[in-house]
A protein has these predicted regions:
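Solvent-exposed, well-ordered amphipathic alpha-helical segments
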Residues: 2-3, 77
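Carbohydrate-active catalytic/glycan-binding domains of CAZyme proteins
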Residues: 16-102
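Sec-dependent N-terminal signal peptides
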Residues: 3-15
Length: 102
């Protein structure tokens, strides 16, 4: 019975797929969501390819984007809202703009 149940769970998990990705065409992580005036705003970290060889195996986050939706189906990318050169506590060129809610 235990083997059968494990096989069933494995089979069900492999068929799952996302039908409405919020963010496509870029890497993101650590999202924070807020609701203002009936609209959901999503603030994720924005991961980019590293311009510095030593950071190739690490995250590289120089800015934050914001996305919004009034129906949770259609999302609008508002682009970069802040970058590392505008934040006094971020060392320029460190690419450490992660976890927007911290």
């Amino acid at each position: 019975m235990k083997t059968w149940m494990c096989a069933l769970m494995l089979a069900l998990s492999t068929g799952a797929s996302a039908q409405n990705p919020i963010i496509s065409g870029q890497y993101s992580a650590d999202p924070t969501a807020r609701v203002f005036n009936g609209k959901v705003y999503l603030y994720p970290s924005h991961d980019i390819p590293s311009p510095i060889e030593k950071l190739k195996e690490w995250f590289c986050m120089a800015d934050y984007h914001v996305f919004s939706s009034s129906n949770l189906t259609e999302w609008q990318d508002h682009g970069v809202i802040v970058s590392q050169d505008k934040v006094p506590w971020v060392q320029d060129g460190s690419y450490t703009m992660w976890a927007p809610d911290c």
